[in-house]
């Protein structure tokens, strides 16, 4: 019994992470990291970026400077709620204002004199409009007092015209580990990026590359385009660190394999040859000469001292305030990795590994754009001052330049899907699924152009570094995004940190490191470098590394550093480094802690009794050593046990090798995969297809469907699923519903429900079963004069319009009806005409195949009349509509049957849906049967022993055997009816019933699987996809059907099609289209005697059957499809003879000529 308790304990701890944690400010866990990211930007980071004081121009040896100062940054929230924004048809934005002062500083003997040039106090209501992220319950980070709407999970932006926008998270291009590349045999590069800390603004980027060619070891250089000299890295390290070449040799050779030591010796010897080739070599003189040569090459206007200071001071911006000696030791540690990677590439994190990447969240998007646009804004001011001084001789700035920062356009482009000239960051949220609001903000994708340029084809595979942090099921199955977009698992999140918190945390960690004995943290020759965000701070005694890391992790969990998401990674395997990561954009998730071979949750006896009353933050405070937040880099270089069960089966010595233990399998799925049931009981592809279909399921009504003029599909009578997982419940996907419970029967019905075809009951449809309502936006722009023109002849298209020229509310629009008046008029140049004014209707018509009711009409009057109309339509299931279960058993309505046509059980109950029974075996979806069994068992006992309603927990991925669920169903039926016989009980457990034929009223020979299941309706609707028609609009030029389904278009028969029919004949053309393609065409030889296909032996076609009989038949060449040839071969292999016979008739071109009589006609 203890084993079961322990296995439940890790599951309960995992559930604690998923539920809200108000004490820690977590009200909605799935999107909490996005809320924090955006809140950090708009409350803190925006002020840091916009608050600027820096020189624009300098003159006279820097004694005169033009300065710019931006201050008084204020961010004001909107006065209305998101629902009011929807009613008004406006965006939901915050207003940012600031004050700009431009002045001239002149250095005099008395001091600095300041002369004002220009200023602007930004009070414009449109200066900077920042789209506000709507959080859980319609909250926003600027005004947390907004009322809560429980079913609104947020995570979206409301763009102009009240269109919701939502986007994925992009993988940052800059890597935290240097990128190793084999250029050609024996030629390698090691490139890395250096980015200044978040407190340094504007952010400085430097990109460096170390090159090595085995044939030219003297050219082991480090370089950077226009920002650094090209120099031998060994000599640069010596220059910065002030150590000897022998010191560098010992440092590079320490704890390295023999082959690497040999290469190190060769490299140091080559560096010595450089020094020996120069008379009286001095390292300072050598570097100064290279700097002077670079100064001349770049034709810099700076003095040589300023140029040298700029180049060397800004070298490695991420170590900006670090002494040069530590920079030199950092270069030595990089060189160690480079040389080791040459021989052991597979042990080094490759460029596709998520260990090397940070992730851009919503706040980071806006932060990057704000930083870039501010630099453009300041650059425009600088250019305007220079132009005015050049043309007018005065230092002045045009007011238009001051009042147009450019951020509005950048933010608008961001919400339109363009982030720094690359697509894929944002997309419009489709309103048919609640899961899209969760799945898209939790998706992580690569830049599309990054994949094309860098040729990162291997990234499309499931990378080992994604294990546990990403869902392996919820990935695109087809299209250009395959392998480029991944879904976070339910326990994963992305870190965020304020600049002030970053600096405090860095200070505390440095103080902790320096609390060690000085000699123990100064092992720069043979020690383990300690880096904080890649910045070297110390080098630890190798004998102390295990104690240091263990103590650091314990202090971190106890809150010693004030941040529980710090990552500490011990990199062994000869690379020898301790990496401490504290920055934003890291993937983190909780793990169970293993300390000295003991699972720490076992040594806390009070935890189990107190767990129900505690939140996740309470566990971290009161039991700090039970759970640890681990980033993906620390996880990759740690020993992690797969499950608690496997950990307990190990010996004590084996347990001591592990650092962490994982939670059960259900926590490795994403939130979309968690909406499925028992995917580990099905075949693998069903999980991927199930996730794609679950995101296409139509869900319940949104809170402001009648206010928001936007496209949407909504389920009319949703039901909460009975069989759920904990993630489905805590994410509120279950509460917001995305389907209905229906009664299904697995059987064949008159041969109609073949393949994906399903039979659906007519009365079920009439009662509102899986009924939906479609909201559709229609938008037209009409010239003002056209809108004011009156129609001369009454048009049927204007029958639904009122006198004001707009469509009536509650009018039912049909195909061809106009939504607003649009009459174009023209004057004829005819003096004899009585009325030279002609007018004609150019209005846009309603084109859908179904009638819709007008719900709302909005009009904006500018230079044009912009009319937006919202139409609503209730749409019941019809032939061709698609449905699915949560196990990816997709079905298409093949027949709508009356209740009298369907089989019934002993109680007269008929199934709502009949599904082809063979689909279970072909698709191997055993969990669909389990879901029906559990749902039926719930109906027998819907309450627990305390009288509380309890849904059935059936996680998407679980380690529970099927027998356990059968036992659960057995107990439910025995509780409600203990007198059942064994056969009756077995039939109820396995949902087997005797059904009766509706035509004969006789029972079927075998029992039928019959029970309830949660059924989903997909957004693929027949009437939205129908495009082909015989009658309709025609183009004026060619008098054929126009193109496009929205315009009522059809198939056009063009000139090329006409010419083919005329020249080739209709029959031959159809044959070519259907058969004679390059991929399908095949020539075969057929024996005219026996009808077999001839075999080719040594290049000679032979009929095997006739050759054995010593016959010499005639072989005739025919053209056929490859599929036909394979079919005949397969049939022959199964003993079925298919004879190809030829029609015997005289040839049409070689028949005997008719006799011609040449006698004169009068003699005949």
From Swiss-Prot:
Top-level taxon of origin: Viruses
EC number: 2.7.7.6
Alphabetized SUPFAM superfamilies for the sequence: beta and beta-prime subunits of DNA dependent RNA-polymerase
One function term, GO molecular function aspect: metal ion binding
Keyword Hydrolase belongs to the record: no
Protein name, entry field: DNA-directed RNA polymerase 133 kDa polypeptide
BP terms from Gene Ontology: DNA-templated transcription
Enzymatic reactions: RNA(n) + a ribonucleoside 5'-triphosphate = RNA(n+1) + diphosphate
Chief location bin: virion
Subcellular location: Virion
Top enzyme category: transferase
Family affiliation: Belongs to the RNA polymerase beta chain family.
């Amino acid at each position: 019994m203890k084993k079961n308790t322990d296995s439940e304990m890790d599951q309960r701890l995992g559930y604690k992470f998923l539920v809200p944690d108000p004490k820690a400010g977590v009200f909605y866990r799935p999107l909490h990291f996005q809320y924090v990211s955006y809140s950090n930007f708009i409350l803190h980071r925006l002020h840091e970026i916009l608050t600027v004081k820096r020189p624009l121009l300098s003159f006279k040896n820097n004694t005169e400077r033009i300065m710019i100062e931006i201050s008084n940054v204020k961010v004001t929230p909107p006065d209305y709620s998101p629902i009011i924004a929807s009613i008004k048809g406006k965006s939901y934005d915050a207003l940012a204002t600031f004050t700009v002062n431009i002045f001239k500083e002149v250095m005099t003997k008395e001091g600095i004199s300041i002369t004002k040039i220009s200023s602007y106090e930004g009070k414009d209501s449109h200066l900077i409009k920042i789209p506000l992220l709507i959080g859980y319950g319609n909250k926003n980070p600027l005004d947390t007092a907004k009322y809560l709407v429980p079913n609104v999970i947020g995570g979206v932006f409301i763009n102009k015209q009240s269109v919701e926008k939502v986007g994925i998270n992009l993988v940052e291009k800059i890597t935290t580990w240097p990128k190793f590349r084999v250029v050609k045999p024996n030629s390698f590069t090691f490139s890395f990026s250096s980015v200044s800390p978040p407190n340094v603004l504007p952010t400085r980027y430097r990109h460096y590359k170390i090159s090595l060619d085995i044939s030219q070891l003297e050219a082991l250089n480090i370089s950077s385009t226009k920002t650094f000299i090209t120099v031998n890295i060994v000599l640069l390290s010596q220059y910065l660190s002030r150590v000897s070449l022998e010191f560098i040799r010992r440092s590079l050779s320490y704890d390295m394999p023999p082959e690497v030591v040999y290469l190190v010796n060769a490299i140091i010897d080559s560096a010595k040859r450089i020094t020996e080739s120069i008379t009286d070599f001095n390292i300072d003189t050598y570097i100064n000469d290279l700097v002077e040569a670079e100064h001349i090459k770049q034709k810099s206007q700076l003095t040589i001292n300023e140029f040298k200071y700029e180049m060397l001071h800004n070298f490695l911006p991420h170590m900006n305030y670090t002494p040069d000696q530590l920079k030199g030791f950092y270069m030595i540690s990089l060189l160690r990795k480079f040389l080791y990677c040459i021989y052991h590439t597979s042990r080094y994190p490759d460029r596709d590994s998520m260990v090397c990447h940070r992730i851009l969240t919503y706040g980071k998007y806006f932060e990057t754009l704000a930083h870039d646009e501010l630099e453009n804004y300041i650059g425009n001011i600088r250019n305007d001052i220079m132009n005015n001084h050049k043309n007018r001789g005065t230092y002045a700035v045009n007011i238009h330049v001051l009042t147009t920062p450019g951020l509005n356009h950048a933010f608008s482009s961001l919400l339109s899907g363009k982030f720094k000239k690359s697509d894929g960051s944002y997309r419009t949220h489709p309103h048919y699924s609640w899961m899209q609001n969760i799945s898209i903000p939790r998706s992580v994708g690569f830049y599309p152009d990054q994949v094309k340029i860098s040729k990162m084809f291997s990234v499309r595979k499931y990378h080992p570094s994604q294990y546990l942090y990403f869902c392996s099921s919820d990935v695109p199955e087809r299209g250009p995004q395959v392998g480029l977009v991944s879904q976070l698992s339910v326990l994963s999140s992305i870190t965020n940190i304020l600049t002030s918190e970053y600096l405090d945390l860095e200070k505390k960690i440095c103080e902790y490191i320096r609390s060690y004995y000085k000699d123990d943290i100064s092992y720069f020759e043979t020690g383990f470098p300690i880096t904080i965000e890649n910045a070297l701070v110390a080098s630890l005694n190798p004998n102390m590394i295990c104690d240091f890391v263990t103590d650091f992790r314990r202090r971190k969990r106890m809150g010693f550093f004030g941040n529980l998401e710090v990552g500490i990674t011990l990199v062994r395997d000869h690379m020898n480094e301790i990496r401490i990561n504290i920055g934003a954009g890291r993937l983190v998730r909780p793990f169970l802690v293993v300390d000295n071979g003991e699972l720490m949750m076992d040594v806390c006896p009070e935890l189990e009794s107190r767990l129900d009353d505690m939140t996740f933050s309470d566990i971290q405070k009161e039991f700090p050593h039970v759970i640890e937040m681990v980033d993906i880099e620390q996880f990759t270089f740690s020993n992690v046990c797969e499950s608690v069960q496997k950990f307990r089966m190990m010996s004590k010595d084996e347990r001591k090798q592990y650092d962490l233990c994982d939670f059960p399998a259900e926590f490795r799925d994403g939130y979309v995969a968690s909406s499925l049931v028992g995917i580990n009981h099905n075949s693998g592809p069903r999980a991927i297809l199930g996730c794609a279909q679950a995101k296409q399921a139509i869900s319940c009504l949104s809170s402001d469907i009648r206010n928001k003029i936007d496209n949407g599909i909504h389920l009319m009578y949703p039901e909460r699923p009975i069989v759920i997982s904990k993630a489905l419940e805590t994410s509120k996907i279950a509460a917001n519903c995305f389907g209905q419970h229906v009664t299904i029967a697995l059987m064949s019905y008159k041969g109609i429900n073949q393949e994906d075809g399903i039979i659906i009951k007519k009365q079920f449809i009439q009662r509102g079963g899986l009924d939906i309502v479609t909201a559709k936006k229609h938008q037209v722009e009409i010239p003002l004069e056209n809108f004011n023109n009156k129609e001369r002849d009454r048009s049927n298209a204007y029958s639904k319009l009122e006198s004001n020229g707009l469509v009536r509310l509650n009018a039912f629009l049909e195909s061809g009806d106009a939504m607003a008046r649009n009459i174009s008029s023209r004057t004829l140049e005819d003096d004899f005409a009585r009325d030279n004014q002609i007018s004609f209707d150019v209005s846009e018509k309603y084109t859908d195949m179904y009638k819709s009711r007008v719900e709302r009409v909005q009009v904006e009057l500018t230079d044009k009349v912009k009319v937006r109309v919202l139409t609503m339509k209730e749409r019941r299931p019809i032939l061709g509509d698609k449905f699915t279960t949560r196990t990816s058993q997709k079905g298409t309505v093949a027949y709508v049957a009356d209740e009298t046509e369907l089989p019934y059980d002993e109680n007269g109950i008929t199934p709502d849906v009949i599904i082809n029974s063979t689909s279970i075996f072909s698709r191997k979806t055993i969990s669909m049967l389990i879901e029906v069994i559990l749902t039926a068992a719930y109906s027998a006992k819907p309450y627990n022993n305390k009288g509380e309603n309890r849904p059935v927990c059936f996680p998407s991925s679980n380690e529970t055997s099927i027998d356990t669920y059968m036992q659960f169903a057995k107990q439910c039926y025995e509780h409600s009816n203990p007198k059942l016989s064994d056969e009756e009980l077995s039939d109820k457990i396995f949902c087997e019933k005797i059904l009766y034929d509706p035509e004969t009223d006789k029972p079927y020979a075998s029992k039928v699987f019959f029970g309830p299941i949660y059924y989903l309706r997909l957004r693929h609707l027949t009437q939205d996809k129908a495009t082909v028609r015989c009658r309709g609009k025609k183009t004026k030029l060619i008098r054929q059907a126009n193109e496009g389904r929205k315009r009522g278009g059809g198939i056009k028969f063009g000139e090329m099609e006409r010419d083919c029919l005329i020249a080739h004949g209709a029959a031959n053309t159809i044959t070519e289209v259907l058969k004679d393609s390059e991929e399908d065409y095949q020539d075969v030889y057929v024996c005219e005697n026996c009808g077999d296909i001839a075999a080719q032996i040594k290049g000679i076609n032979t009929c095997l059957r006739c050759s054995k009989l010593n016959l010499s038949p005639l072989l005739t060449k025919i053209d056929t499809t490859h599929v036909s040839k394979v079919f005949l071969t397969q049939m022959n292999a199964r003993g079925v003879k298919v004879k190809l016979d030829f029609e015997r008739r005289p040839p049409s071109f070689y028949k005997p000529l008719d006799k011609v009589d040449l006698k004169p006609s009068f003699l005949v």
